[in-house]
Every structure is written in C-alpha cells, then in structure tokens.
Amino acid sequence: MRAAQLLGVKTVLYAVTPGPFEKVKERELALSVFSSFSLVVIREKLSKKNLEKWGFPTEHVIWAPCPSFLFEANKSYKSEWTEKIENTHKNNRKAIGITFGGFNMPIGPYDMWPRENSQYTVFLEIAKYIINHMNSDIIIFSHTNGFELPPNFKLKPGRDYMILKQYYDLLVQKNEKYKQHVTLVDEPLLPCDLKSLIGKMDMLITGRVHASVAATSQCIPTVYIEYDRNVIYSDKMYGFSSQIGMDEYVCIPGDRESLKNTILSCYKNIEQIKMQLQHRIPQIQMQAEKIFEVIKEDVQGSVDL
C-alpha cells in the first residue's frame, strides 16, 4: 500500500476497524500510510475516537456501515439444519443460535489447541440455562470456514469449529437428554446458506461480529459476546451494536451473570427488538449503499468531507 502511495496512486481505506496502534513497533510507518489515504471509511463511529486517542489524523475519516449489512441470504436454502429449526418450532420451543471462537475464550492465544475442558465452564452453564429455563433449543454453528484452493476447491471447517465441536461434546456428555435439544452444524456452509439458516432462528448469541450482522440484518435479536481483553483488544462488538441501538446486549465473556442476564433480557424482549431492527436496518442498509457514491467522488477528486 505504501509503495502505491509513493508512486502517486490515490488510495482509499474502506470498511475498516483501524488499530490498535498503542504497541505497534512500526508506528511511524503505520501513521505515514494512514495519513496518506485520501479517504478512510470506518465501520464503527467508536473508531474515530480511538484514532484521535492514538494520535492519528481524522480529517479524512468518515463513517459508513459495514457492507456486510447488504449481503443477501439464499432464501431457497433448505437442509437438515433448517428442518431441525422447523421441528423446534413445532414443539413450541424457540431456536437460539450460538457461535464463538478463540477470541472469546478465557485463555489465549486465540488459536490455542487443544483446550482444557475447564475453559468451557461458563458457556456450558449458559447452554444448560437456555435449555432448562428458557424453553429453547440450541443450534451451534461455526461462522468462520475455510476452503481448499482451486483446482480442488471445496469448503472446509475453520478454526472455530474445533472449539464448538468440543463445546457440543462436553454438553451432551454431561446429559444425554441434551442431544434432543442441541444441534451441531457439522459441515461448512456457503455464506449465503449460513445467513439463511441464521435468519430462521429466533435469537442469536455470538462472539463473531459478522454473525451478528447476518442476524440483525434479518431482524433477528442478538446478544454480542465481546472478545476477551486478555486475548485481544477490540471495540468491534460495541461499535457494531451501538449503530443499531443494540449496545445493551453486549456482554463480557467469562462473566456468567452478565451473560445470563443479557441473554434473558434479549429473550424477554424478542418482539420489541425485532420491531426496533425492522425500523433501523433499512436505514443502515441505505447508508451502506450511499458510501459507494462518496468513494467514487473521492477517486474522481470531487468529494467534500
């Protein structure tokens, strides 16, 4: 990127959560590259305050919602997983999705493997509470999947799947009866199919920010689990949730009571949250589309910040 800037090429940084820059050894280079962008489009308004705190210029920084709010689900998607949700509803129970990864675990690094069973204690207690006290079934799925490169292209489970598979195994080992109330999606899905699956749920609990977008963009009430600050610093969960009025549903990983109370609050207010999202999401999507015109004008040299 710096090479392009030195050659006089106009560069735009788009849909970004910059930083943190507090401990970056190459801070001088980062500052030089950042200052040379003609336009920086941040995904969360909170990022601008962070940039100012870190001493980075913000005159060329503007906010627009993440373009992932515009991603469309495969409305025709059907599978054994959607059938599970349909059966849950026939039994007059709600279907609650759960996904998280290494950034939400109490011990780092995020890619630690294997993991001790004790690291799942809080998540296990939350699952049991949902099943026993919230009249709900659980759909566990990975929102980060990989693929093999062409010519042998095929989807494969990402790193989160190992963590979630261990979570599922520990849960059903504790009580065989939980098998009828807990489903593990044990295959990687195309993004459009996964979004469709999420859209059929009644509620989502997520430690992955783009899973929250997949849910809220379809007006599915969502609980956000922050990244554990002992593993990595990030304000993304607060940033994404606050722009749609959902910041009260952000909770700290590892805090059993915070998780339980936040999940219960979301559950009790499902219909109210849906109405709130039905009002807010179209506005967010309109803003996400408008930024493309701003970028075009910047590239053509006529943007007025």
Tell what function each PLM region has.
Residues M1-L305:
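Active-site anion-handling motifs in enzyme catalytic cores
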